[in-house]
Amino acid sequence: MSKSLPYSVKDIHYDNAKFRHRSPLKVFSQSLLTLSTKRNYASCSTGKFLILILFFGVACLMLMSKSPNESGLNEKGKVTFVGGLRLGGLLRKPPRLPPRLSPDEGQLRGSSTNGSTISNSDPKWAARQQSVKEAFDHAWSGYRKYAMGYDELMPISQKGVDGLGGLGATVVDALDTAMIMGLDNIVSEAGSWVETHLLERISQKGQVNLFETTIRVLGGLLSAYHLSGGEQGTVNMTHVGPKPVIYLNIAKDLADRLLSAFTSSPTPVPFCDVILHESTAHPAPGGASSTAEVASVQLEFNYLSSISGDPKYSTEAMKVLAHIKTLPKTEGLVPIYISPQTGDFVGENIRLGSRGDSYYEYLIKVWLQQGAKLNSNFTYLHDMYIEAMKGVRHLLVQNSIPKGLVFVGELPYGSKGEFSPKMDHLVCFLPGTLALGATKGLTKEQALKENLLSFEDLENLKLAEDLAKTCFEMYEVTATGLAPEIAYFHTKDYTEDGLDGGNKSSMYANDIIIKPADRHNLLRPETVESLFVLYRITKDTKYRDQGWQIFEAFEKYTKVKSGGYTSLDDVTEVPPHRRDKMETFFLGETLKYLYLLFGDDSVIPLDKFVFNTEAHPLPIRRNT
């Protein structure tokens, strides 16, 4: 942790004596003394006499410049000179200078690493935001030409593929991104497809995953409903496409079928697979569900209950978190599997990567969605989150050698087993979540000013910034400038030579290990997500600069001329071998977060919206 004073007590110890209160008489006398010492010609008696004449001459001119009828008492009975000039006017204190800032506070006020502040209207960032919009248009054009209605695009083969149940996942995932970007032509195309085809697809399709369908399709529909003006008097980002009620009705139909995952289970833990056309559900082949998956559908079901007026969606989804509250944990940390049959955790594997990640994300986001401190019924979620983050710092955070990168590892065999210095790119959601949990969506400066940050919040915010650096260095260390799916870190107990990222100039080339099986890049959003949140909260433009660097690498190595972007097999080689798949989250998350990172803070403000784990913004509940 930083050796500097905690942010909340820095001002107590910082010397601000220069600006203590001084009386008007003292100000006046000191002004004369200062004037006399700064003018060499005033050192003689004649000079002093001339200065006095000049001073009183100016005063007389000021007095006589007003009308005589303004003399006497003013409306409040205070004595004035002729012309209405108060006695205090001549003895007025000079303008008060801004308080001198401590070095740390000075860094807080300056948003960039060189101390300059770059506004959201800066043409450089406006141009970069436009570049992201053009990238989204290019990605969509490839999908529209070769894969419209399929879940995903294979941009090199120029065809579509259904890997998520055949619900046109890319269409729904991309819809609210197009709304936010103001791309009305794409909103119209995607919205028309949703209105014409999606309801029929839902009624006819077979097995889908509860989690993936909820976060991508249900979440996308709900966000589109809100952003298109579904809740009157709130936001309306588009005037094209279907009426908002169309999105809502399709969302309800889909959610009604997904509810079978909850109602079919003998415990509050839902099954993971749903047969849509039958409205039935069953457990996974191994029997267990993923902890992250069953605990990362609550934002969507809560919001659907709010706008539909039917509590059944929220009731079923929230039973999961209430149940997990009762289960034994390891310093707030939980295994990555849970059984729908018994309701208990399965195994001891603890990690914040795959199958564990969004459990922790939704603890704090569901609490925020429900009004945070305004709703005491959900306080237990905040308590669980705080306990879990303490556990992360105590059990999972270590430093690499030789350069000391902060990373989050894993406990494959529980807290009594051996620590693994393995960190999925998925873990890079954590810096953003930590920052959001610390300030509750406010800027760091505002939260400090209002004295809203606890010591725990400050610890989490510091960890967020340290981890964000590590996540960015996972990009910097490779030959392509794009991160691998998984990285390992050199520690005093773990070392493996010859598996660097290919960028020998990186100062962290000896800290980060990239194994051959982990060198692929799937166009994932987690790092740019955290850069976006941290920029919004800290106003430090290094996060924008880093985001732009990542975007340029995507443009250079993953763009397909005929349309779309593709995953890579190996980020440590140039040119990299391409994998021929554009994940839906590249349009739904990665490009959305980059666009927002370079844009105005008033668009989807973090104190009024929470993003689901697929980057679909949903409004925070407000007490009326």
UniProtKB/Swiss-Prot annotation:
The species this protein was found in: Arabidopsis thaliana (Mouse-ear cress)
GO cellular component: endosome; Golgi apparatus; Golgi medial cisterna; membrane; trans-Golgi network
Family (UniProt): Belongs to the glycosyl hydrolase 47 family.
Catalytic activity: N(4)-(alpha-D-Man-(1->2)-alpha-D-Man-(1->2)-alpha-D-Man-(1->3)-[alpha-D-Man-(1->2)-alpha-D-Man-(1->3)-[alpha-D-Man-(1->2)-alpha-D-Man-(1->6)]-alpha-D-Man-(1->6)]-beta-D-Man-(1->4)-beta-D-GlcNAc-(1->4)-beta-D-GlcNAc)-L-asparaginyl-[protein] (N-glucan mannose isomer 9A1,2,3B1,2,3) + 4 H2O = N(4)-(alpha-D-Man-(1->3)-[alpha-D-Man-(1->3)-[alpha-D-Man-(1->6)]-alpha-D-Man-(1->6)]-beta-D-Man-(1->4)-beta-D-GlcNAc-(1->4)-beta-D-GlcNAc)-L-asparaginyl-[protein] (N-glucan mannose isomer 5A1,2) + 4 beta-D-mannose; N(4)-(alpha-D-Man-(1->2)-alpha-D-Man-(1->2)-alpha-D-Man-(1->3)-[alpha-D-Man-(1->3)-[alpha-D-Man-(1->2)-alpha-D-Man-(1->6)]-alpha-D-Man-(1->6)]-beta-D-Man-(1->4)-beta-D-GlcNAc-(1->4)-beta-D-GlcNAc)-L-asparaginyl-[protein] (N-glucan mannose isomer 8A1,2,3B1,3) + 3 H2O = N(4)-(alpha-D-Man-(1->3)-[alpha-D-Man-(1->3)-[alpha-D-Man-(1->6)]-alpha-D-Man-(1->6)]-beta-D-Man-(1->4)-beta-D-GlcNAc-(1->4)-beta-D-GlcNAc)-L-asparaginyl-[protein] (N-glucan mannose isomer 5A1,2) + 3 beta-D-mannose; N(4)-(alpha-D-Man-(1->2)-alpha-D-Man-(1->2)-alpha-D-Man-(1->3)-[alpha-D-Man-(1->2)-alpha-D-Man-(1->3)-[alpha-D-Man-(1->2)-alpha-D-Man-(1->6)]-alpha-D-Man-(1->6)]-beta-D-Man-(1->4)-beta-D-GlcNAc-(1->4)-beta-D-GlcNAc)-L-asparaginyl-[protein] (N-glucan mannose isomer 9A1,2,3B1,2,3) + H2O = N(4)-(alpha-D-Man-(1->2)-alpha-D-Man-(1->2)-alpha-D-Man-(1->3)-[alpha-D-Man-(1->3)-[alpha-D-Man-(1->2)-alpha-D-Man-(1->6)]-alpha-D-Man-(1->6)]-beta-D-Man-(1->4)-beta-D-GlcNAc-(1->4)-beta-D-GlcNAc)-L-asparaginyl-[protein] (N-glucan mannose isomer 8A1,2,3B1,3) + beta-D-mannose
GO biological process: carbohydrate metabolic process; N-glycan processing; protein glycosylation
Compartment list: Golgi apparatus, cis-Golgi network membrane
Function field: Class I alpha-mannosidase essential for early N-glycan processing. Removes preferentially alpha-1,2-linked mannose residues from Man(9)GlcNAc(2) to produce Man(8)GlcNAc(2). Involved in root development and cell wall biosynthesis.
Spans annotated as Disordered: 91-123
Protein name: Mannosyl-oligosaccharide 1,2-alpha-mannosidase MNS3
SUPFAM superfamilies linked: Seven-hairpin glycosidases
EC code(s) of this entry: 3.2.1.113, 3.2.1.209
Composition-biased stretches (Low complexity): 110-121
Main location, first listed in the record: Golgi
InterPro entries: 6hp_glycosidase-like_sf, Glyco_hydro_47, Glycosyl_Hydrolase_47, Seven-hairpin_glycosidases
Cofactor: Ca(2+); Mn(2+); Mg(2+)
Disruption phenotype: Formation of aberrant N-glycan structures.
Disulfide partners: C428-C471
One Pfam family of this chain: Glyco_hydro_47
Lumenal side: 65-624
Pathway: Protein modification; protein glycosylation
Tissues expressed in: Expressed in flowers, siliques, stems, leaves, roots, stamens and sepals.
Transmembrane domains' residue ranges: 44-64
